[in-house]
Amino acid sequence: MRLLAEEQKLGTLELLLTSPLREFEIVFGKFIAALVTTMVMVGLSLYFVLVLFVYGDPDIGPLLTGLVGLTLYASATLAVGLFASALSSNQIVGLVVGSGILTTLTIIDFVSARLSGTAAQVMDAFQLGASFSVFDLDSFGVAEGGHFADFARGIISVTDIAYYLSITAVFLLLTVLVLEARRWR
């Protein structure tokens, strides 16, 4: 949440906005920096995949598609966080707004299960991930629905890829619009 909120708080956002960089370049640069940092952390977790291959014979498909899905999920959540960070100079406000958006996108499955017809179908289309519980003995803590479930099963779905890329693009665009509006205030 420090990506843009800290810049606003310290007054360095004005320096960035008066530089020859366009707002899109600033937002995209901060997004790529956060995504690379996240991918380094994901890369460090590949140690566990190595241990799996040393002590067993796992199926490589779900492992690789899980990493692809995790990358796409991370890009979507980072874009939402960057947008929330652009809205306020307070990091806590950015955290609350970003968490609220992500929670809303996650619990859509819970809400849509209690609806029927077109409303349920529309809400299912906007679900970020599956709401699952470690206490649910039927799912064993694995997402059974949502856009991430196919990646966890080893299936690459163009619909799921397009969804995560769309969420990422929409929230990056909204972040650019917030910064452009700030310039004109």
Give the location of each predicted region.
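Short cytosolic juxtamembrane segments of multi-pass membrane proteins
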Residues: 181-185
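Terminal transmembrane helical anchor/hairpin motif
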Residues: 101-178
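Alpha-helix N-cap/start motif
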Residues: 23-24, 91
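Transmembrane helix boundary and interhelical loop/hinge segments in multi-pass membrane proteins
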Residues: 1-17, 31
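Secretory targeting signals
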Residues: 29-93, 106
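Residue-level hotspots within the lipid-embedded alpha helices of multi-pass solute transporters
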Residues: 3, 38, 70-74, 164-169
